[in-house]
A protein has these predicted regions:
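Amphipathic alpha-helical interaction segments
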Residues: 12, 19, 115, 185-186
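Intrinsic-disorder/low-complexity loop/linker signature
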Residues: 9, 24, 88, 97-101, ...
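Oligomerization/assembly interface segments of phage tail-like spikes and tubes
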Residues: 70-86, 172-190
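Small/polar-rich, solvent-exposed N-terminal microdomains that initiate assembly or binding
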Residues: 1-69, 134-139, 143-156
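Protruding loop/beta-arch "assembly-hinge" segments enriched in small, turn-prone residues
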Residues: 187-200
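Extracellular/virion structural assembly segments
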Residues: 2, 67-73, 80-129
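Acidic-leaning, charged glycine-interspersed low-complexity segments
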Residues: 105-185
Length: 200
């Protein structure tokens, strides 16, 4: 089973702006949620949450790919959340609220593009691993992530349709938090045979 959430959490750990602590003892910046609008862990703790942070929707959104009946198309929903800086008003400096709001939106956009660049490299490295072209000891963070993945997960990465990724910001939510939603399609092979081991 392809667990994209685990790959995204690994990225959140090595990506400096997030610096997620996977053990939950320090800075938590990665969340597994149903939807951004539901009462989830981030929403319950937004006043204490570290900024920036990200969330992955664990809801399954899939369909049979029309162009290829042997494939399934999955749609992955990822959210980047950035808290808008509080405006500062004093005799020397007046920070326009619209400026801090724009900064938050563009910061989320920058993180989306950083993730897509990372996933592009991850796809290339997993393709090398699948083809047996990664014979050296893993050196980079990307090589270490790919080498730790089972073959099925490496194949799942190759199905990510990054060129068709779509993203955009939502109106402000949760007391000065801005959300940028990212949608990525993944094409996976469909089971064509009944697995007899799953039946009596």
């Amino acid at each position: 089973m392809f667990r994209f959430d685990n790959i995204l959490e690994a990225w959140a750990c090595i990506y400096k702006p997030l610096s997620h602590d996977i053990n939950g003892h320090g800075r938590k910046t990665f969340y597994r949620i149903d939807t951004i609008n539901n009462n989830n862990e981030f929403v319950q703790n937004y006043n204490l949450a570290a900024t920036p942070c990200m969330a992955y929707s664990t809801l399954v959104d899939a369909s049979r790919a029309r162009a290829n009946a042997k494939s399934i198309s999955y749609r992955h929903s990822i959210y980047f959340m950035v808290k808008q800086a509080a405006p500062q008003h004093n005799a020397k400096t007046v920070v326009n609220d619209a400026d801090t709001e724009t900064d938050a939106k563009y910061y989320a956009d920058e993180m989306v593009q950083d993730l897509l660049a990372f996933l592009d490299e991850l796809k290339k490295e997993s393709q090398r691993a699948i083809n047996g072209n990664s014979t050296h000891q893993p050196q980079t963070a990307i090589e270490r992530i790919v080498s730790a993945l089972p073959k099925e997960e490496q194949m799942g990465i190759n199905g990510l349709q990054l060129d068709g990724a779509e993203w955009g910001t939502f109106p402000m939510k949760y007391n000065r938090w801005w959300v940028c939603g990212l949608e990525i399609e993944q094409i996976s092979p469909r089971l064509l045979c009944v697995n007899g081991e799953k039946y009596y």
